[in-house]
Amino acid sequence: MAAQCVTKVALNVSCANLLDKDIGSKSDPLCVLFLNTSGQQWYEVERTERIKNCLNPQFSKTFIIDYYFEVVQKLKFGVYDIDNKTIELSDDDFLGECECTLGQVVSSKKLTRPLVMKNGRPAGKGSITISAEEIKDNRVVLFEMEARKPDNKDLFGKSDPYLEFHKQTSDGNWLMVHRTEVVKNNLNPVWRPFKISLNSLCYGDMDKTIKVECYDYDNDGSHDLIGTFQTTMTKLKEASRCSPVEFECINEKKRQKKKSYKNSGVISVKQCEITVECTFLDYIMGGCQLNFTVGVDFTGSNDDPRSPDSLHYISPNGVNEYLTALWSVGLVIQDYDADKMFPAFGFGAQIPPQWQVSHEFPMNFNPSNPYCNGIQGIVEAYRSCLPQIKLYGPTNFSPIINHVARFAAAAAQQQTASQYFVLLIITDGVITDLDETRQAIVNASRLPMSIIIVGVGGADFSAMEFLDGDGGGLRSPSGEVAIRDIVQFVPFRQFQNAPKEALAQCVLAEIPQQVVGYFNTYKLLPPKNPATKQQKQ
């Protein structure tokens, strides 16, 4: 029997006394959460933001985890000093790790452990603190904020202001729950609209004190406090664009020194709107269909399928990396599609009868009906197609991304959250049309679709890591930024010795939040509202 998710848990992470691996500055730490539910294989769940020049980081990124009462969920928090833009951790300095179970964190509410190196020895005096909260409230607060004339802390320029939000815990301490972006060189900063869950902000208590701090960002990590104010949600939600709520930013040290001190700037709240966000299950139970499409790389770099060295070579027991990846991901996602009819395409091969190179040919060779019956149907189409084509090139992703995007664009015209598209591309990794693919992904980020890329073989996957926006927003060649991160890349060989469900768990981990993120952004509700249905019963 499958484990039932009891609840969702939010984990906040901070570290103290980290090892300093940088010469002339301090480490730039980032925390990675790994999960293990069976065997020896750990898989990455998510990463915090990177904090520059800091040995005592408080990460604002919150890890959201499903808590299964009857499953021992082993967690590993790895801390790394990030000095480059690659997604790989092997080329970053390791600052220490901590292993525990989710049950231990939940029962402690706050767990502090020493960080240890891979050999089990202490990572200097480094420690990690993990705080856990159950998420019961799906209300979120949408903010629009700006400031006027915050104190100028920079000698040769203007301040680089950012805000931090803190809530007060039951033991009286302050816990940071959100950090805005830095607005560079600006004494009248306008921050991008942002949202914070009401539970994270104030435990859902409208009269709970919230502390907001304004800082001037410094590259060396010694951020200067401009000022602070305290308020409550009751006060904040009075704000509107017509009538903003304003707060004086007070720096206590300056106030005590100067009798004429007035303030260190004014923070203006232009919008503070509470809204209820549907969960992934609300959408699925409310009738939203996940439409699954497969794209398979048939380029010459895979080698001749008849050769045992080829990535398309089907072994005597009937498998290869392409088929294993397809089964692993497809078996999970097919449960969310009612008719289980999936379009499957190949790209990069010469196809009969003219032997022209095609970058989006149906694997069943039926252009008017490229649908296959379930994952088994896709596997059969793949096996049948392989001996009929000539592997060629180049490796172009953009045609198949644009193909799915056309269907997603049509679905985007609907007034409810009825359809979401997931494209699985399985490739050996040497991409040719990088600029066109970047543009296609940026365009698709505005549509109800996500892209999963599974890299098979041992090729250079640096281009794939570039497309996965985890290191920062992907940009088109013209500089246009993707409004959502919709690409998830995973190298297949990372999971070769893992339980068969591990690959699917990893590549599908971001899909629920991408689905929710899209529909909530456009304020689309499920076709059938589950809450309404329950009330009628």
From Swiss-Prot:
Compartments reported by the entry: Nucleus; Cytoplasm; Cell membrane; Cell junction
Molecular function via GO: calcium-dependent phospholipid binding; calcium-dependent protein binding; metal ion binding; receptor tyrosine kinase binding
SMART domains: C2 (SM00239), VWA (SM00327)
Binding site for Ca(2+) 4: D154, D216, D218, D224
GO cellular component, one term: cell junction
Binding site for Ca(2+) 3: D154, D160, D216, D218
Gene3D superfamilies: C2 domain (2.60.40.150)
InterPro entries cross-referenced by the UniProt entry: C2_dom, C2_domain_sf, C2B_Copine, Copine, Copine_C, VWF_A, vWFA_dom_sf
Protein origin, superkingdom: Eukaryota
Chief place where the protein resides: nucleus
Disulfide cysteine pairs (residue numbers): none
Cofactor: Ca(2+)
Modified residues (Phosphoserine): S14, S197, S243
Record-annotated VWFA domain positions: 291-513
Keywords carried by this UniProt record: Calcium, Cell junction, Cell membrane, Cytoplasm, Membrane, Metal-binding, Nucleus, Phosphoprotein, Repeat
Post-translational modification comment from the UniProt entry: Phosphorylated on serine and threonine residues.
GO terms for biological process, alphabetical: cellular response to calcium ion; cellular response to growth factor stimulus; ERBB2 signaling pathway; positive regulation of cell migration
List of residues binding Ca(2+) 2: D22, D81, D83, D93
Residue span, C2 domain: 1-115, 124-247
Physiological role: Calcium-dependent phospholipid-binding protein that plays a role in ERBB2-mediated tumor cell migration in response to growth factor heregulin stimulation.
Family the entry assigns: Belongs to the copine family.
Name the UniProt record assigns to this protein: Copine-3
Species of the source: Pongo abelii
Gene giving rise to this polypeptide: CPNE3
